[in-house]
């Protein structure tokens, strides 16, 4: 999109209502540990336990659990109890677009 497209009316800016709705989600996702968790869950393609996520994130249970709670509170993740385990999965697939941008920036 360029300024000429906006001036000609062929494209429009994202509404403030939409931006206000998604800003808290972006703010909460934009944390290195949370991004790492999302990257791991995306690559696994199926729900994973806290212990699996701890191992992949190379972090302790308290830190991982705190980050999972934040993502769950924003409806980015779902949590489902199976026996003694709680399995986490990505609920809002649109956040994966942010990961794609990061992966693109990682390339030399």
Q: Where are the model-predicted features located?
A:
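N-terminal helix-turn-helix DNA-binding core of bacterial DNA-binding proteins
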Residues: 20-60, 82, 86-93
